[in-house]
Amino acid sequence: MHLIYIVMAATATTLHASSSAILDPSDVKIMTKNVESRIGNDAAFAAGRFLRGAYEDVHREEERMFGLKQNQHSFIKPSQAQDAAAIDALNIAKEALESTRNTKDHPHATATAGDQSLNPLIAAYPLRASPNAGVPQQHLGVALGSVHPHTSRST
């Protein structure tokens, strides 16, 4: 009887802990911060911070110092190459964000505004026209060696 009670109590505690971890936004925020780089200056970190907004950049130095205290044994000072990569990523992110805002005015944009908001880097690079852009569909088949739809086969 005691064994059943212990198993039930352990199961209830585990379920409560897992459900509170899933539903608690602060736990989710901590988990997403752990996914990011501890260095703070690599390209993915800089681009992610920029795309999420400037508000988090205000507290970036505080977070870096907190990370330094928490992870003194594994903290790595960013190199010049990482700083250059962060600057490049930040410039690409800025261009992507600006071109996303100007999607309606972009002459080569074929994606919808919804697609642009899902992937802002789509707008960073101009879309290339297809090599067969001006060729009517019926002539494409002839160019590829198939039978033209308006010709008849006589055997």
Swiss-Prot record:
Primary location class: secreted
InterPro entries on file: RXLR
Localization per Swiss-Prot or TrEMBL: Secreted; Host nucleus; Host cytoplasm
Span of the signal peptide: 1-17
UniProt KW Nucleotide-binding keyword: no
Protein family according to the UniProt entry: Belongs to the RxLR effector family.
Reported function: Secreted effector that completely suppresses the host cell death induced by cell death-inducing proteins.
Protein name: Secreted RxLR effector protein 38
